[in-house]
Amino acid sequence: MIPQISQAPGLVQRVLDFLEALKQNGFNGDTATSYADRLTMATDNSIYQLLPDAVVFPRSTADVALIARLAGEERFNALTFSPRGGGTGTNGQSLNTGIVVDMSRHMNRILEINVEQGWVKVEAGVIKDQLNQYLRPFGYFFSPELSTSNRATLGGMINTDASGQGSLVYGKTSDHVLGLRAVLLGGEMIDTRAMPTALAETIALDETAEGRIYRTVLNRCREQRALILEKFPKLNRFLTGYDLRHVLSDDLQTFDLTRILTGAEGTLAFITEARLDITPLPKVRRLVNVKYDSFDSALRNAPFMVEAKALSVETIDSKVLNLAREDIVWHSVNELIADVPDKEMLGLNIVEFAGDDRALIDGQMETLCQRLDELIAQRQGGVIGYQICGDLAGIERIYNMRKKAVGLLGNAKGRAKPIPFAEDTCVPPQHLADYIVEFRQLLDDHNLSYGMFGHVDAGVLHVRPALDMCDPQQEVLMKHISDRVVALTAKYGGLLWGEHGKGFRAEYSPEFFGETLYEELRRIKAAFDPDNRLNPGKICAPLAVDAPMMQVDAVKRGTFDRQIPVEVRTSFRGALECNGNGLCFNFDVRSPMCPSMKISGNRIHSPKGRATLVREWLRLLAEQGVDPLALEKQLPQQRLSLRGLIEKTRNSWHAGKGEYDFSHEVKEAMSGCLACKACSTQCPIKIDVPGFRSRFLQLYHTRYLRPVSDYMVAGVESYTPLMARAPKVFNFFFRQPWLREMSRNAIGMVDLPLLSSPTLRQQLSGHRATTLTLEQLEGLSAEQRAEHVLIVQDPFTSYYDAKVVADFVRLVEKLGYKPVLLPFSPNGKAQHVKGFLTRFARTARKTADFLNRVAQLGMPLVGVDPALVLCYRDEYREILGAERGDFQVLLVHEWLQQRIADRAEQPATGEPWYLFGHCTETTALPASGQQWAAIFARFGAKLENVSVGCCGMAGTYGHEAKNLQNSLGIYELSWHPTLQRLPRQRCLATGYSCRSQVKRIEGNGVRHPLQALLEMIE
């Protein structure tokens, strides 16, 4: 039995008083003080961890103004505040103690657009890709690019002055901010914009906080103008935080306070709204993907690409390329970046040309390609080949692979992981190759592996050395390397932070600004935040305040993780290796990962949130001397005793009375998971939440009773075959309002599905498929066996959607084969989902033995439902290891592909069909949709794959009363609107859960694609 974890970092009373004051004064947002909520805000995409006191989620600028006004009261003057956006920073920019003000949950509205004047007004929590999705129909986009664009907020981009691919042409975020609405501590609101310096001088006369700020900034930037121009490097990625260089125009006639706030990392004010300029979408885009024999060749060839008038040049090294090959993303780009025969591709330059003049763009590209042909022919420059990509979909796929690079590095094998701390250095592009030679030598001298990729056109290369932050010696080495890189960038006239902001690296600021200008930064900080209460420790401290800065060698996630025994860390690597890249925060409702995060907006209910809580739970167990691995080994031998039941009942009673146990907070996070497994493939780190979730649930319920619904779900494969013997009787009762009400209230289950009537056996009555025994099959000759197909049943299609299985039997026959319906053998998936792992192991072992025996016949085994078939491949291998054997159960499309491979495609006739893929299937088998389309093409039909997220059913998740609203809400995100615009009779879905959800909500369901094929053949 696991112990109670009753201790959690407490809350300061004044923090609770502040939150109560917010509530009393009409705050419309959310507040959070649980340990779980605070832990999810304690990390970002960096190596650091800092636990905040509380989190607030304002809904409007008025809410932020209320926070700031109350913060200005004397009783709360000891509290500090840190604004937070997407939480994707790589250097802890938004991490702090104190109160986190999260702008991402609610403040995500696009407020106004003026196409004629070319601007848009947004709230700070709007996500970059969300804005571009909105702008696309107008023919515009917000041009600063970054790899986390599908989860990074514009407020975060502004606060770090973010930039990325294409910055040589498009510049940094600050180049596109026309004005900001910001709230100062005390509640005063200011609106910034570029204005005549004379007007700024007038504002500076006001005896307000705004007037004080204008006076200070005007005076300091004028007085130190010559030194500013001397010290600030003339780079595309110019020095920010604070951007003294661009406050005044070159002729000193224009003043823009916006430039001070962009890149300020929330140290000066709360930015709540922004007016941004927007850029027309280029009418023509072309990519030339240039392949090299080495990364050094790619680097040294990059300046030539820039001279060829390219919009951007992105470089990727062999380490990143090889990791991409092992990821789900590679199937989408492997034809666009194909290997060169007899050559090894060890470097790649992605060169983009874009504009409105097709002839000009094509001419620029052809000039480059001619030069590349010469280099290849002469075997110079390390160029081994290139490919051109001219279609927008292909271009987006390549950039998605490039954007995933940072996450892919985190999936490198071993304890040492490539980490960010010197990953966005910037030097003049002409010095980049030489700079990288020295940088690589530094890392090689310490025998470190590393991955490199970046924006070589701008002189920015992302370098991530692999270090184990659980090893104190390597933690010290990280600081040593960081210091050396600072000196190296200075040597080449560059910057340590060319893209991602300073964060914990602000301690190096004096070395780049110089002491005089650094003092000016402190004066400006004092004008905005004299008491050092906004994100303290970042950028600089106010001039009159003697406060320490955050340090590069501050407390890291590894400091906490190393308290967990190595064996436990290794066993739970699915949780421990989360690096916070945040891809699970993707705003796009069509992305399958993660439906619970999308519907709740609560990061506890994301793979990152769940991984964070489990790693802390493991640490707290270790603190009490508890080994979860030993407990897991003991469980199969344990038997339920009266004493144990009494103890569990007592523990559960105390829990119901409010007795604290951190395990309850972890359980709450795990209960929201749909177990769709999208994270296990879509996450670049392959964080497998359903895997460690089932292990947690098993251990949690050694201490606490299970709800009745858990037993009902886990036993579905035991009682369903029995009920199916009298489906009309059971369906009669299932339709009764009183039973449905009792099911909801007593068991916690809703909308229970009706059993198939007629049953599968009745539909196939007398059919040869149901009469052959295993012994008879074993007696068949090799020739006879080649004619047979063995259908592996699952409980859902066989008993609740039997016509699909019956139709598959007919389809197999129509294709000239003899189907055989194998006896039903429980799969155990539901047991795994609910954490009955001991029972699941028994089920899996028994079924694996049966399927291994059947597999020896040499006949194909085919299952209908993707989730159940994939369970044989994943969960069975995980729980049984080598005992699983080597049986293989194919999905319907996999078998069809093999059987009709030599059948020629036929001209498509009639309306297209539309395929809605199952989440588990489309993420585990990303080519499945295209494979179904190819199968349909061979029968003269067109099949289009529909891009949707999760349907919200996920096995029994949608039938549990506590999940009902989320289940319906998830369906509304993408499935409902998509189905409304398509002809229902042409829509198809491979998953039983998906078809069941459509039928429940829409009233009439959709068919399995095999049924459409059968219809075509018949």
Predicted regions and their residues:
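Terminal amphipathic helices with adjacent charged low-complexity linkers/tails
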Residues: A274, L281, V306-A416, G454, ...
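Iron-sulfur cluster-binding electron-transfer modules in prokaryotic oxidoreductases
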Residues: D529, P536, P690-E1018
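Ferredoxin-type iron-sulfur electron-transfer modules in oxidoreductases and energy-metabolism complexes
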Residues: D546, M550-N581, F585-M723, A841-T847, ...
